[in-house]
Regions:
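Hydrophobic helix-and-loop "lid/oligomerization" segment in the mid-to-C-terminal part
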Residues: 242-337
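Glycine-rich, acidic loop segments that terminate in or are immediately followed by a histidine
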Residues: 193-205, 228, 301-398
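Short beta-strand
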Residues: 59-60, 116-120, 212-213, 330-334, ...
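Functional cores that coordinate and move charged inorganic groups
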Residues: 89, 108-218
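A conserved active-site cap/scaffold subdomain adjacent to cofactor or substrate pockets
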Residues: 199, 211-258
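Active/ligand-binding-proximal structured segments within catalytic/core domains
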Residues: 36-52, 76-127, 372-373
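A generic structural motif
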Residues: 30-31, 64-73, 125-131, 341, ...
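Conserved nucleotide-binding/hydrolysis modules and their immediate coupling elements
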Residues: 1-79
Length: 398
């Protein structure tokens, strides 16, 4: 059994402990101590990390009554070692977890929304709510949560028998829990059963910042950050806005308007380019058809190679080539280190593009698929891809 010192003192940064066992597995060397300051991953909170006897400890997990610590090197059984926390990581995790309690209490108190899911990743924290809230409502909850932080309220841990829980005003009660339960309380605020580590006062959280929310099942998923993570995230995004402003030659507050104007200009240019491309293909298609192979029944077979071409442009040219209904055509175009192709057969032809696509895939070292009158695929780029297009025209006719 491992004594969990972090349950009584979340501010304890180190301790002396005796190595009870050490065994190698896929994750590293699994070390069990008689006591530990390291919180094992659980309850939505990330594992602590640090060192054991100077050896890097990267992950801790609870197995039964023991906490298993994964180290990069083995530790001698029976030896006393110093367990030292990566304190910055612990503080980051405490800020996120305590912030989650306070934000969850805010949406519950203000709007009756329940937190039904909590996840903490590296620089990403989410809660899932069982009802939808608007951006304005979330902003109100964010303001309320931050007011709880700035009032610097005490956060306390207590242990109570489960029979006393009905007397507490808790946002979430799990009636399946029995025995002595660990209760985390924010003064005049959230009360919740919790196994995690928390700062001593709300002021240590510093800040809660909601970044986004999305529809999730019958409610929403709220993405947020607290403390140092929130500060660094805001600093990074602020730099993005300043960079965008410099590129647009305007102040940061003008960036949204500048981007809208730029988007309108790009849309207009794309429409003009699309119109010019259509005109070009009106001229190019007859030239390509004039060079097409023709069988005894009058069906034309043509394969065109296009260097600078988008997928949409390739389809446009293909449609121009197929306009008479008696043509089998392929448009092959380069996209970076890939060669792509679109195949089509007119309604008055007997050609099956599925079969032609298999042949084209073999020719270009790739694959594709489709239906009788249209298919598409691609393969790897090679220097002789234009010569292969000439071969493809012959394959279309066979």
């Amino acid at each position: 059994m491992t004594e969990k010192l972090y349950e009584q003192d979340s501010m304890l940064k180190s301790c002396l402990a005796t190595v009870l066992s050490c065994a190698e597995d896929k994750r590293g060397y699994a070390v069990v101590l008689d006591r530990t300051v390291f919180f094992p991953e659980g309850g939505g909170q990330l594992s602590d990390r640090g060192t054991l006897g100077g050896v890097k400890m990267t992950y801790a997990v609870q197995r039964g009554s023991e906490v298993v610590h994964y180290c990069e090197r083995p530790l001698p059984v029976g030896e006393q070692v110093e367990a030292v926390l990566d304190w910055q990581a612990r503080l980051d995790h405490m800020q996120q977890h305590a912030g989650e309690h306070i934000l969850s209490h805010a949406v519950w108190k203000l709007f009756g929304a329940n937190n039904i899911g909590f996840h903490m990743g590296e620089r990403l924290v989410t809660i899932d709510l069982d009802k939808e809230l608007t951006a304005a409502e979330l902003a109100q909850a964010e303001d309320y949560a931050n007011s709880q932080i700035w009032e610097d309220k005490p956060i306390t841990v207590s242990y109570l028998p489960h029979t006393e829980l009905p007397a507490l005003v808790m946002r979430k009660k799990n009636e399946k829990l029995t025995g002595t339960l660990r209760i985390v309380t924010v003064a005049d605020g959230d009360i919740c059963t919790c196994c995690g580590t928390h700062p001593l006062r709300t002021g240590m959280i510093g800040l809660i910042r909601i970044n986004r929310f999305d529809k999730h099942k019958d409610g929403i998923r709220v993405e947020f950050l607290c403390g140092r993570w929130a500060l660094e995230d805001a600093r990074r995004k602020n730099e993005y806005v300043w960079q965008a402003g410099r590129l647009l030659s305007m102040k940061p507050e003008g960036v949204p308007q500048g981007l809208r104007k730029l988007q309108e200009e790009v849309t207009e240019l794309n429409e003009r380019l699309k119109a010019q491309t259509a005109k070009l293909y009106e001229f190019l298609a007859p030239q390509l058809l004039a060079q097409a192979a023709v069988d005894e029944g009058g069906t034309k077979y043509v394969a065109a190679a296009q260097e600078d071409c988008s997928a949409a442009d390739a389809r446009l040219l293909l449609n121009k080539l197929l306009a008479d209904g008696r043509t089998v055509a392929a448009v092959v175009y380069r996209s970076g280190e890939r060669i792509n192709f679109v195949l089509g057969s007119g309604e008055q032809t007997q050609a099956d593009c599925r079969s032609l696509c298999r042949k084209a895939g073999e020719l270009f070292g790739g694959r594709g698929g489709g239906a009788q009158h249209f298919a598409q695929g691609g393969g790897a780029y090679s220097d002789d891809w234009r010569q292969k297009v000439l071969q493809l025209q012959q394959l279309l006719k066979e």
